[in-house]
């Protein structure tokens, strides 16, 4: 049983949610990148709902089992995988963040669960190399004359 983990997961997820909303709106409104705003908003909003549930769960019970902690980190991994699918796949500069739940898992959970989460992350990364919605940057790519 991990006594601190749920509170830490809640804090980490709030940071991730803030970063995700900021990146989505910055890309769409400032950089004029055409991304599926409604779909990405729904995916991040689901994370907000899960985090509120976790917050009220923590108020009732400070301890959390390894399996429950793993399920939270698995959700975070899948949620980020869906966001990356919607926003350009593996070429998205934020794709490296798929490692964050694995690193958190390595810090708190047994090696077996960390290996399982690592394998799932690897499968997501490989899938994102082939299946994703390409970003429409609104401009043609060209090389300047030298």
At which residue positions do the language-model features occur?
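Canonical alpha-helical transmembrane segments
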Residues: 47-62
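Short, Lys/Arg-rich, polar N-terminal cytosolic tail immediately upstream
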Residues: 1-5
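Alpha-helical transmembrane segments of multi-pass membrane proteins
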Residues: 47-51, 103-106, 125
């Amino acid at each position: 049983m991990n006594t601190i983990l749920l509170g830490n997961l809640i804090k980490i997820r709030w940071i991730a949610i803030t970063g995700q909303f900021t990146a989505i709106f910055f890309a769409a409104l400032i950089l004029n990148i055409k991304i599926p705003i409604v779909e990405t908003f729904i995916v991040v909003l689901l994370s907000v709902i899960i985090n509120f549930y976790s917050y009220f769960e923590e108020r009732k019970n400070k301890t959390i089992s390894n399996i429950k902690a793993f399920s939270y980190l698995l959700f975070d991994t899948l949620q980020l995988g869906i966001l990356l699918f919607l926003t350009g796949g593996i070429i998205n500069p934020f794709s490296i963040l798929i490692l964050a739940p694995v690193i958190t898992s390595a810090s708190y959970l047994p090696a077996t669960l960390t290996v399982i989460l690592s394998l799932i992350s690897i499968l997501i990364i490989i899938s994102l190399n082939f299946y994703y919605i390409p970003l429409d940057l609104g401009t043609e790519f060209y090389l300047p004359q030298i």
